[in-house]
Each structure stands twice: as structure tokens, then as C-alpha cells.
């Protein structure tokens, strides 16, 4: 194989790898309607006392609207997932299971207008919370 061909293949491979990495970062969060429904039930039972029944905030910060947008919009969904998993509930941090953090994240995303997808939210979910 000539040096020119070898360099061309290496360049094409590098460009393709960059495309894949960019595409993975650009994808939006994915969760199912079932996860959001389950998260809504858990939220009502365990989270609403601090964050309000409508996610409007009370003792804890609002999880919907401008306050949510300013903190989470455009960022990786895994950051929101990790925050919920590690710091909630405030009186028992790091007590949630991964599945609980996933359904709560799904519910919060749905309440903020992020549409459900066909893939269930995974642990350390890929993608971003879309900007408005």
C-alpha cells in the first residue's frame, strides 16, 4: 500500500471517528412514557413535599421552567441523572437505586417538554437535554 493511500485511509478513519463522537454528543435524551409515568408516581410520593406538586419549587428548587432551564438545558442528561442519584433525597443522599434515578429523570424531562422516545433511559444516559 502506498504512503498516500495509507495516509488517506487514516485521515478518513479519523474523520469518521470524529463524526461518531459528535453525533453521540448531539443526540437528545431518551426515555419511555412508562418510565415517565412511573417517575411521576414516585415523584408525588417522595419528592413533591420539597419540590412542589407541580415541580414549582418549595423547600427545594423548582424542577420545571426557567430555573430548570438555566441549570440543566443544553447539558448532558447524565449530569441530571447523576445529581438525582447521588444527592436526592436531601435527607438521605445516595440512597436511590439507578432505576429510581432513571424514572425520576424521565419524569422531570417530560414535565419540561422533552418528548419521550422509544429507548428506555439507561444508567449514565447518553445525550443532552435539548435547548428550547
Language model features with spans:
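Flexible coil segments in periplasmic/lumen-exposed cytochrome c-class electron-transfer proteins
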Residues: 91-132
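Gly/Gly-Pro-rich "capping" loops immediately C-terminal to redox-active cysteine motifs
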Residues: 36, 56-89
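The canonical Cys-X-X-Cys-His
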Residues: 39, 43-53, 104, 108
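Electrostatic cytochrome c docking/interface patches
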Residues: 22-42, 92
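Cleavable N-terminal signal peptides
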Residues: 13-14, 24
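Bacterial N-terminal signal peptides that target proteins for export
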Residues: 2-12
Amino acid at each position: 500500500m502506498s504512503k498516500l493511500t495509507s495516509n488517506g485511509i487514516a485521515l478518513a478513519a479519523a474523520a469518521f471517528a470524529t463524526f461518531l463522537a459528535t453525533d453521540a454528543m448531539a443526540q437528545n435524551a431518551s426515555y419511555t412514557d412508562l418510565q415517565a409515568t412511573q417517575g411521576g408516581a414516585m415523584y408525588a410520593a417522595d419528592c413533591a413535599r420539597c419540590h412542589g406538586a407541580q415541580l414549582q419549587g418549595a423547600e427545594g428548587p423548582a424542577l420545571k421552567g426557567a430555573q430548570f432551564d438555566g441549570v440543566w438545558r443544553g447539558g448532558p442528561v447524565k449530569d441530571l441523572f447523576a445529581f438525582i442519584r447521588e444527592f436526592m433525597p436531601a435527607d438521605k443522599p445516595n440512597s436511590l437505586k439507578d432505576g429510581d434515578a432513571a424514572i425520576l429523570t424521565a419524569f422531570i424531562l417530560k414535565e419540561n417538554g422533552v418528548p419521550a422516545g422509544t429507548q428506555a433511559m439507561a444508567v449514565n444516559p447518553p445525550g443532552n437535554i435539548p435547548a428550547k
